[in-house]
Each structure stands twice: as structure tokens, then as C-alpha cells.
Amino acid sequence: MRIDQHSLKRRHVLSLACASAASIACPALAQNFPNKTITLVVPFPPGGTIDAAARALANQLSSLLGQSVVVDNRAGVRGSNGTSFVTRAPADGHSLLFSNLTPLAITPHMTADGNVINALAPIGTLAYGPQMLVSSKLNSVSDLRSMKPSLGHAGNGSLSHVLASLLSRSLGMRLDYKSYRGLAPLLNDMMGEQVGAAIVPVGAIVGLREPNSIKPLAITAPHKAMPGLPTFEQAGIGEATFNDWLGVLAPASTPASIVSRLNLTVNRIVQMNEVQDRLTSLGLMPQLSSPEQFGTLIKLYSNRMATVIRQEGIQIS
């Protein structure tokens, strides 16, 4: 299976430019920031897509801000551990969170951290991660209705678990779920035809040693990133559309001037060719935003996920 990484990047040039124009106006920048090492907390283990994107960001942040930027992986409880750590950090811009939407819009609805987003100040997005419906034995989305295969996911309370529930709702039928301890064992079993289908990040497929053994059936990206592959909407499963987002946040009381400076810096980084190339190689689509746009995005996704999690009774295992 071939991922057209040039198309992933090229189709977002215009949207990047438009979002950049919206981010130019800002308050006076903090003149004495940063004045020490910045810690970029990643609430997931080292080695994954989010960690790789964080390190690409950290390298450029250090160069542009003139201070060291250290990536600190604090995994646990679907991203809650690292996220909570940042909410308790000094609000001076030197402790930042780099995360996807899981600990911001999904996990809080299954833990006691239901208001975690109110304890954070969104700074801006780096990219979004389209999701892909894949299978090793189905040939089209219509086969889901006729064959009723099992749906794999990466563990109870995971993003792929929520997406499996969304897919069942979109199809109007209940499919059996098969839980795994992460995406790697799920995809290994799929290559052995031990599980029928799953919704996974495009980046998870990019990294496979034998990607041709898994067939893409549909993608959530709003524009076709792979020639001939339908979007979820085109395939009749639009309700399951979910694009994950990666972005930077700070403790809630961080001064607006520091948030503005960080937003402008992150937006500059997103527009660097070398960063865009790195992100697309990870199956991500570069996308910048204002702090307000990122905050609105998180709340929209959080409200949507809250409904699904409540109605489906999804819990963290």
C-alpha cells in the first residue's frame, strides 16, 4: 500500500497560508521569554508518531527561541499522567504539553479529570492525523455490512476503541470488538487475518514492514490523500469521520503575551519545508492554527466524544 506523502503535504499549502494570516495579530510579545530550558511534555511513550513529531518540533523551537527544549515522556492512563503534570506546572511558558486529542477530548470523560481542558491554555496545532479504515480480507466498506467482521481496537478507552464504536453507529449495526494492547499487536493479527477490520492512524500503516498485506478501504482526510481511495463520507460512513490533532498547550494561567509568542513560533515551524516533510513521512498533515481555533476544536471534539463514550459505556481497561 502506497501513501502519497507529496499529496498529503501539497493539498494543505493553501490552508496553511490562510491560517497563518489569521495568526499575525497578537499582543506585545514577552521580552524576557524564554529565560531557561523549556520542557515539552509528551504524555505517551517514546518511539511513536506523537513522540517523533514532538522531537521535530522541539528541535526547531530551540533554534528559534534560543533556549534548550527537552522532550519529557510521561505516559500512563491514556495520556492523563503527562497532561495532569503540565496543568500543575508553573504558568511561565517553560512547561508545555504536546499531545493529540486523546487526553484532552476522550480520556477526561472516563476519569476524574473531566475539566482538564479548563486547566490548559491552547497554543496552536502542528498537524492533524487522518485515520484509515483497513482490513486484510475485506475489499470494500460494503463488505462490512455483508460479512460483519470483528473490529479490532488498541485497548478499552483508546482512540481506536471510540472510533470502532463510531463506525458501528455509522453502519447502523453492532459489530464484535476485539481488544488489543496497542496498535502493533492489532496490526500483526490483521496481517494474519485474525481480525476483520480496524480504524487506525495513517502513520501506523506507513511504519509497517509489510504494508501491502493490509488494504485501505477509506480515509478520513477531507481531501483524497491516496488516489482512488474514498473518504469516509464518500463510503457512506461519514459519522465515523475523526481526524486526530496534534498541538501545543500550556498551563491555563500562562500570560497571553507568552501564548502569542509561542503560537507565532509554532506557526513558523509548521511552514518549514523540512518540518512538513517530516510530518508527512509520519502520516500527518501539517496544519497551523490560532490559540482560539485550537481551543474551539478541542471543545467540539470533546463534546462529540462525551456523547459517544456515555452512550456506548466505554471505559478504560
Model feature map: region roles:
Residues 152-230:
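Ligand-binding pocket segment of bilobal, Venus flytrap-like solute-binding proteins
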Residues 35-37, 234, 259-317:
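An extracytoplasmic/periplasmic, membrane-proximal ligand-sensing/linker region
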Residues 52, 56, 81, 85, ...:
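Extracytoplasmic/secreted proteins, especially bacterial periplasmic and envelope-associated proteins
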Residues 1-27:
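N-terminal secretory signal peptides
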Residues 30-119, 156, 172-196, 288, ...:
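N-terminal (or domain-start) structured segment
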Residues 88-93, 108-185, 232, 245-278:
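Hinge/capping helix and adjacent helix->loop/strand transition within the periplasmic-binding protein
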Residues 29-40, 90-94, 145-150, 210-211, ...:
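Immediate post-signal peptide segment of exported/extracytoplasmic ligand-binding proteins
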Residues 97-103, 108, 182-183, 200-205, ...:
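Beta->alpha turn/N-cap motifs
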